[in-house]
C-alpha cells in the first residue's frame, strides 16, 4: 500500500472519532466572549490524546495594539485563553502554523444540539469553524497513527474572538509566534486560496439644521443630505469595481467589490427635520486597495461631489472591522506545495482569491508569513440557521492537510 492509500485509510478509520468530536464541540455555546468552556474542554481533550496542548491567556494589553478590533460590550479576556498545540519536529524541516477559531456567532438553542444524519453534521459552528478544528486534529492524528514524524515543527492554534475581528489570532502573533508558513482554516468549499479580499466597516454622518417641518425652508434635513452622500458611495462602488476588473484570481461578475449601507438612522420626531443622519456599512475590496486608501478616496469624492452643506458638515471614517486584503504570490513554495497536495487528493484545483476576509490577513501582514486559507464546508451556510458540513469533506480536507505537511515539513527517515 502506498502512502496516499495508507493515509486515506488512516483518515477514514477515524471518521467516527472526528464526527463525535465535532458534535461535542458544537454543544458548547461559544459565542464571542463566552469561549472559556470550549477552550478548557479542548485543551483537556488534546492532553488526554497525548498531544502537547496548553492554554495561552490573552493579555489585556492587546486592546492597545494598533491592529486590535474594538468589540462591543467587551468584558476582558480572563478565562478565555487561546489553545496552542505544539508538535515538535525531528529537525531539519520547514515549520507551519495551522489556525482556526472556536468562537461562533449566536443562534437559537437548537443549533447547539448537534445532529448527525446521512454523513452530514448540523449545528452552529459545524463549518464555521469547529469543523475546521476537527480537520486539523484529524490530519495530525492520522499521521501519528501511521507512525509519521515530521521534521518541521507544527503549531496548531485554536483561537477566540475571530468573529469579532481576529483578536485571538492577533494576540498569538503579538506574542511572537511565527513559522515558515501559515494555513488558516475556514469554510472555503475545499478551495485553495492564497489571497483574500478585504473588508472594512464605515460610519458616515452628516449634521443638519433641525426645525419644525412647517418652517422647513429655514432648516436643513440631514436625511436629505444623507441621500446624496449615499449616492456618492454607490458611485464610488462602481468606480472601485471598474478599477478591480480583471484582477487575477477574482471574478468580474458577480464582483466581490461591494459598498454596502447596512444601517441608516435619522431624526427623532416625525414632524421635525432631522438634525443628524448616520449611515453605517461595509466596503469589500481586493488586494489592489488597502483600508487607508479606501478611506482617503471616499473622503476625496465627498469633498468633490457633495453639496456645499454636506462638504462642511459630513464626516466619513472607517470604524470597527478593518480586515486588510492580502495576496501570497501563487509561485511561493508554500502555495505550490499546498496546491500539489490538494490536487493529489481532490483532482485539478484552480488557485483563487477568497471572496471573504478572515484572520489570514494578520498572519500575512503582521506575521510576514506566506498564508493560505483552506477548509471544508460551504461559506454560504456559515452563520445560517441551516449551518452544516459533510463529514466526507472533513475527511478530504484532512487528507489534503496531512499530504501538505509531509511535503512541506518533510519526514524523518525519508530517503
Predicted regions and their residues:
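Acidic/histidine-rich catalytic neighborhood of metal-dependent amide-processing enzymes
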Residues: 129-201, 251, 409-415
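Alpha-helical metal-binding/catalytic segments enriched in His/Glu/Asp
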Residues: 98, 117-164, 203-206, 216-237, ...
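Short, P/G- and charge-enriched loop/turn segments at secondary-structure junctions
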Residues: 68-75, 190-191, 247-249
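Short glycine-enriched loops at secondary-structure junctions
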Residues: 101-105, 187-190, 198, 267, ...
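Acidic-glycine-rich active-site phosphate/pyrophosphate-binding loop
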Residues: 103-117, 194-205, 340, 372
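Acidic/His- and Gly-rich active-site-bordering loop/insert found
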Residues: 2-122, 150, 368, 378
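Metal-dependent amide/peptide-bond hydrolase catalytic core
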Residues: 1-6, 48, 77, 203-415
Amino acid at each position: 500500500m502506498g502512502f496516499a492509500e495508507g493515509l486515506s485509510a488512516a483518515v477514514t478509520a477515524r471518521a467516527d472519532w472526528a464526527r463525535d468530536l465535532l458534535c461535542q464541540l458544537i454543544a458548547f455555546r461559544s459565542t464571542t466572549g463566552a469561549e472559556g468552556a470550549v477552550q478548557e474542554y479542548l485543551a483537556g481533550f488534546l492532553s488526554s490524546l497525548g498531544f502537547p496542548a496548553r492554554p495561552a491567556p490573552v493579555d489585556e494589553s492587546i486592546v492597545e495594539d494598533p491592529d486590535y478590533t474594538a468589540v462591543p460590550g467587551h468584558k476582558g479576556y480572563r478565562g478565555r485563553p487561546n489553545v496552542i498545540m505544539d508538535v515538535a519536529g525531528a529537525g531539519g524541516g520547514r515549520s507551519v502554523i495551522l489556525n482556526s477559531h472556536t468562537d461562533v456567532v449566536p443562534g437559537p438553542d437548537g443549533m447547539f444540539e448537534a445532529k448527525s444524519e446521512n454523513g452530514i453534521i448540523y449545528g452552529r459552528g459545524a463549518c464555521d469553524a469547529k469543523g475546521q478544528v476537527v480537520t486539523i486534529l484529524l490530519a495530525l492524528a492520522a499521521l501519528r497513527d501511521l507512525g509519521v514524524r515530521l521534521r518541521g515543527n507544527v503549531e496548531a492554534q485554536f483561537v477566540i474572538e475571530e468573529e469579532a475581528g481576529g483578536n485571538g489570532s492577533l494576540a498569538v502573533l503579538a506574542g511572537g509566534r511565527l513559522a515558515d508558513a501559515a494555513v488558516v482554516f475556514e469554510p472555503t468549499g475545499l478551495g485553495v486560496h492564497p489571497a483574500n479580499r478585504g473588508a472594512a466597516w464605515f460610519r458616515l454622518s452628516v449634521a443638519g439644521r433641525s426645525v419644525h417641518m412647517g418652517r422647513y425652508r429655514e432648516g436643513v434635513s440631514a436625511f436629505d443630505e444623507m441621500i446624496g452622500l449615499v449616492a456618492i458611495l454607490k458611485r464610488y462602488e462602481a468606480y472601485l469595481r471598474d478599477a478591480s476588473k480583471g484582477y487575477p484570481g477574482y471574478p468580474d461578475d458577480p464582483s466581490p467589490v461591494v459598498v454596502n449601507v447596512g444601517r441608516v438612522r435619522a431624526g427623532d420626531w416625525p414632524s421635525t427635520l432631522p438634525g443628524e443622519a448616520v449611515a453605517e456599512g461595509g466596503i469589500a475590496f481586493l488586494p489592489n486597495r488597502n483600508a487607508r486608501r479606501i478611506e482617503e478616496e471616499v473622503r476625496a469624492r465627498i469633498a468633490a461631489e457633495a453639496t456645499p452643506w454636506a462638504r462642511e458638515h459630513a464626516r466619513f471614517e472607517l470604524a470597527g472591522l478593518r480586515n486588510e486584503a492580502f495576496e501570497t504570490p501563487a509561485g511561493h513554495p508554500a502555495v505550490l506545495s499546498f496546491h500539489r497536495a490538494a490536487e493529489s487528493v481532490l483532482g485539478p484545483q484552480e488557485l483563487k482569491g477568497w471572496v471573504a476576509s478572515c484572520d489570514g490577513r494578520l498572519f500575512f501582514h503582521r506575521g510576514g508569513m506566506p498564508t493560505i486559507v483552506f477548509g471544508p464546508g460551504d461559506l454560504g451556510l456559515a452563520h445560517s440557521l441551516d449551518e452544516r458540513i459533510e463529514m466526507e469533506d472533513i475527511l478530504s480536507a484532512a487528507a489534503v492537510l496531512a499530504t501538505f505537511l509531509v511535503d512541506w515539513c518533510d519526514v524523518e527517515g525519508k530517503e
